[in-house]
């Protein structure tokens, strides 16, 4: 009976808090229409009180759920401890399997410096802005075309495309 009464009181607190917030919002909108100071005072009292009641109802329902589930968790823990200690099953790796990931990384770390020293070839040159391969002989790339040249080439291509379209239509 006590559990049911607590549930009803919790639901009532949530409902009352929500209704008080809604009523306060209604009084604020009604007060701005009819210019009534009494409704504004009631609204500014109902809004914070409604929020406090609503939040207390939320926390109260959470507390009730935790205390109910705490009993279930205690029961499960007692059953688990009554069975005794858990045995953890492990699997040993046979020698014919490849090495573990961590072991393979250690082997690669040891072999990489030796390979670099043995080759003696420097890495290729790259540009500062990208990762394109840059030839050692061509140290100065050609300059981009001027604005007038690029516009002129665009106009020429547009005119040729337009002429092709007109030729296809006729």
Swiss-Prot record:
Domain of life, source organism: Eukaryota
Region (Disordered): 112-147
Ranges annotated as spanning the membrane: 8-28, 40-60
Main location: membrane
Cellular compartments annotated: Membrane
Membrane topology: Multi-pass membrane protein
Keywords recorded for this protein, A-Z: Membrane, Transmembrane, Transmembrane helix
Keyword Membrane: yes
Keyword Transmembrane helix included in the entry's annotation: yes
Name recorded for this polypeptide: Transmembrane protein 252
Encoding gene (name): TMEM252
